[in-house]
């Protein structure tokens, strides 16, 4: 069975491509993946946001979709926030870890202090994750994400639960 890899390009896509510096094929890929279901006007708006915040939809730093009321929702992911942070001269790194039931863990937000240790014994179930964003010109930002609150049982959460909850904590810390 042969797959058809042709890309259909409309005059609207050509105009959008010209306006935002993408090729016609790239606009088609964006409109059928990370901006699926958007109208030409919504796609133009989305690409303008991508350009203005300097985030790349091809590596899922930013994407959009339509909700059940047909509203356009635009999201920046953890990789988008990390890309923006890495361009900042004050960014000095990020550290994160999942927290499990058998870990020794304490968090003192007022004093920007986390103590987290675990050994080689069974760590137990994941209960959350934390992230610390370090800045050269200020205090670190610490965020904690509760696993039960964020885990909705989607496939990625089933196969990579530690990575998913760390991404949530990192996103919250990077946003600040």
Predicted feature locations:
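Binding-interface segments
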Residues: 2-176
